[in-house]
Amino acid sequence: MTEHVNSYYAASANKHAPYPTLTEQLECDVCVIGAGYTGLSSALHLAEKGYRVVVLEAARVGFGASGRNGGQIVNSYSRDIDTIEANCPPDQARLLGSMLFEGGQIIRERIKRYNIQCDLQEGGVFAAETEKQLHELKSQYARWQKWGNDQLELLDAKGVREVVASDRYVGALLDKSGGHIHPLNLALGEAEAIRIQGGLIFEQSAVTSITPGQPALVKTAKGAVKARFVVVAGNAYLGNLVPELASKSMPCGTQVIATEVLGEERARSLLPQNYCLEDCNYLLDYYRTSGDHRLLYGGGVVYGARDPADIERLIIPKMLKTFPQLADVKVEYTWTGNFLLTLSRLPQFGRIGPNIYYMQGYSGHGVTCTHLAGKLLSEVLSGQAERFDAFAKLPHYPFPGGRLFRIPFTAAGAAWYTLRDRLGV
């Protein structure tokens, strides 16, 4: 059986009973493939509307990126809204802009409605290491205000040192509508909410085939589901189940470490307001403190979903560059997880035939975008396709180099942007 990786999140997960493996033939309205945030959000929105929902998960609820990520509620999409405005028709850009901050609102509504215990903390910081990055943050401030975010504050060098005890930054953008959570506990809470709403979840039930039709037939090793609709929500862990999706996306790994417990006083000395933080580099660092006062620090990207040989060797120098005062601190957990990157860094939504839908490729902004995706999926199945189609109409292209050479091509591009970050150009 495939279990959760040995992460801090798995070690501190809320108590929960495992879900059964599918061993029978079922019929339902919607079969959701994948119990990460995309699948859970879709299933919960649909179950609340009265749909009969079955969720099939190859491993455990929140096994992939949804249970391993940095836990940061980051608003917007991975690609800035100005790029969308410059490349999309005005009506489409307007729709996409109107949804920039909706994902975080959905998360908070879920936490409140279902009393999900996941260490929700408010506030997130985007920190600039160079004047060029700070100038870009000022532009982002103006754009986000235009689209309705009135919880923003620009911080100068003095201001940023009041929210993070580091000399690394020249300024920052504080988004008080951002925040952070224990990501696995959020996923587990949402799964329980699906159960409360009458949905069925099956773990250790990897899908082996999808046969289109009315109804569609979804098979696992020991069972099958006939469904009016199918939602493909495997993201970076989908494998080759749907080959036509593979060429336009690429799994990438990112690494996270968790220190020993620092104690509340020392943890607050690092991040006095308990905000989460990410920098503005192309290959960015991100970090926050946990509910039990550890520092969780992540960064770097491994293209092609290969596990890094030594996570501590990669991440500890990054942590000490930001917080040299932690040189004496032990690291207790290290792990990696895959997210799905698209060439445009915009999510991929679409249809495979009349009744099979997919949402994937959040490119590092999955915590919020996945929750929005589930809501939009429930809308389109209820006959309201406009907002879903605003994403579905976004163009997507294969990675250069094909399956054999796309990793070195993409890594070379990332190395170029990393060099630009270091040079401040």
Label every PLM stretch briefly:
Residues 68-98:
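Glycine-rich active-site loop/strand segments that organize a redox cofactor
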Residues 305-307, 312-422:
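C-terminal catalytic lobe of FAD-dependent flavoproteins
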Residues 139-143, 168-228:
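Helical element adjacent to the flavin cofactor pocket in flavoenzyme catalytic cores
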Residues 105, 113-121, 207-209, 224-354:
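Active-site substrate-recognition segment that forms the wall
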Residues 28-55:
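N-terminal Rossmann-like FAD-binding beta1-loop-alpha1 element of flavoenzymes
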Residues 48-68:
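Glycine-rich FAD pyrophosphate-binding loop
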Residues 2-12, 79-85, 106-123, 128-189:
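Flavin (FAD/FMN) cofactor-binding and adjacent substrate-gating region
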Residues 1-30:
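Extreme N-terminal leader/targeting segments of oxidoreductases
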